[in-house]
Amino acid sequence: MSSRPPASFSATFSAARSSKCVPPPRRPSTDVSLPSLRDTIQAHGLDAKKSLGQHFLLDPGICARIAALGGDLTGRSVVEIGPGPGGLTRALLDTPASRVDVVEIDERAWPLLDELATYYPDRLHVVRQDALKLDAATLAPAPRQIIANLPYNVATPLLVGWLRQASQWERLSLMFQLEVAERICAAPGSSAYGRLAVLSQWCASCSVALRIPPAAFSPPPKVHSAVAVIIPHAEQPSPQLFRAMEQVTAAAFGQRRKMLRSSLKSIGGERLLEQAEIEPTRRAETLSVAEFARLAELNLASR
């Protein structure tokens, strides 16, 4: 299979690239000659496993554009989740990042990643763990970023976990299914606006930076993908306030077609809404992030 994307993909990706004017990544001063990614995959007999939500991104040009979303990585630590055969990993190592930690649960990929680490003995570190059970912020010193093509089946819980400790991260550049990326960045009143949008936008500024079609992956997924760039705010909620927000948004959007006085009943909704000066007949999707923040503060204070 050719590593060049089809013409339809090139047009789509070029349009996204030009609209964002993402600069190319800076290369380190010492070039490393690596075997081709496809040859490496073939030599190790690695294929994407559906049960792990894997879709390998092999095009080096696209991987470079994703790595560039981190900005100038000089002196930064980068964590990548689910590197698989290492296509994006190679692009990250081709930036000035001081170190790259890759977290991989699939033991079939470990020998391949270990082999890549021999070319970058002081920069690439292979972490053989389940990212859902790992405090990724403990892997490397700050300032640190996460840049990753996330496994689809664990992408949302991973993001929520990182939002709980958003102060630990300078930036998150994460690939999701397009629908999930749009939910993260959705505005109030839209059908995509929900719990994920409120939690994400409460803690960070969020934008969809790149849209990538199925043809860019092996095997091609059934849906389009997108990279969301999430930049945490300077001030972050306390862990207690974050839990209060999770409770409010879970109740509000768990019954999103109901009026708030009904959907929030289990947490004393009538009283909270009155204190927040929010009409109890409104529905969850009409509230701004700031209004949800006020409800979370009142919810915490009432405990």
UniProtKB/Swiss-Prot annotation:
<feature type="binding site">
    <location>
        <position position="104"/>
    </location>
    <ligand>
        <name>S-adenosyl-L-methionine</name>
    </ligand>
</feature>
<feature type="binding site">
    <location>
        <position position="130"/>
    </location>
    <ligand>
        <name>S-adenosyl-L-methionine</name>
    </ligand>
</feature>
<dbReference type="InterPro" id="IPR023165">
    <property type="entry name" value="rRNA_Ade_diMease-like_C"/>
</dbReference>
<feature type="binding site">
    <location>
        <position position="82"/>
    </location>
    <ligand>
        <name>S-adenosyl-L-methionine</name>
    </ligand>
</feature>
<protein>
    <recommendedName>
        <fullName>Ribosomal RNA small subunit methyltransferase A</fullName>
        <ecNumber>2.1.1.182</ecNumber>
    </recommendedName>
</protein>
<dbReference type="InterPro" id="IPR029063">
    <property type="entry name" value="SAM-dependent_MTases_sf"/>
</dbReference>
<feature type="binding site">
    <location>
        <position position="149"/>
    </location>
    <ligand>
        <name>S-adenosyl-L-methionine</name>
    </ligand>
</feature>
<keyword id="KW-0694">RNA-binding</keyword>
<dbReference type="GO" id="GO:0005829">
    <property type="term" value="C:cytosol"/>
</dbReference>
<dbReference type="InterPro" id="IPR020598">
    <property type="entry name" value="rRNA_Ade_methylase_Trfase_N"/>
</dbReference>
<keyword id="KW-0963">Cytoplasm</keyword>
<keyword id="KW-0489">Methyltransferase</keyword>
<feature type="compositionally biased region" description="Low complexity">
    <location>
        <begin position="1"/>
        <end position="19"/>
    </location>
</feature>
<dbReference type="GO" id="GO:0003723">
    <property type="term" value="F:RNA binding"/>
</dbReference>
<feature type="region of interest" description="Disordered">
    <location>
        <begin position="1"/>
        <end position="34"/>
    </location>
</feature>
<keyword id="KW-0698">rRNA processing</keyword>
<feature type="binding site">
    <location>
        <position position="55"/>
    </location>
    <ligand>
        <name>S-adenosyl-L-methionine</name>
    </ligand>
</feature>
<keyword id="KW-0808">Transferase</keyword>
<comment type="similarity">
    <text>Belongs to the class I-like SAM-binding methyltransferase superfamily. rRNA adenine N(6)-methyltransferase family. RsmA subfamily.</text>
</comment>
<dbReference type="InterPro" id="IPR011530">
    <property type="entry name" value="rRNA_adenine_dimethylase"/>
</dbReference>
<dbReference type="InterPro" id="IPR001737">
    <property type="entry name" value="KsgA/Erm"/>
</dbReference>
<dbReference type="InterPro" id="IPR020596">
    <property type="entry name" value="rRNA_Ade_Mease_Trfase_CS"/>
</dbReference>
<keyword id="KW-0949">S-adenosyl-L-methionine</keyword>
<comment type="function">
    <text>Specifically dimethylates two adjacent adenosines (A1518 and A1519) in the loop of a conserved hairpin near the 3'-end of 16S rRNA in the 30S particle. May play a critical role in biogenesis of 30S subunits.</text>
</comment>
<feature type="binding site">
    <location>
        <position position="57"/>
    </location>
    <ligand>
        <name>S-adenosyl-L-methionine</name>
    </ligand>
</feature>
<dbReference type="Pfam" id="PF00398">
    <property type="entry name" value="RrnaAD"/>
</dbReference>
<dbReference type="GO" id="GO:0052908">
    <property type="term" value="F:16S rRNA (adenine(1518)-N(6)/adenine(1519)-N(6))-dimethyltransferase activity"/>
</dbReference>
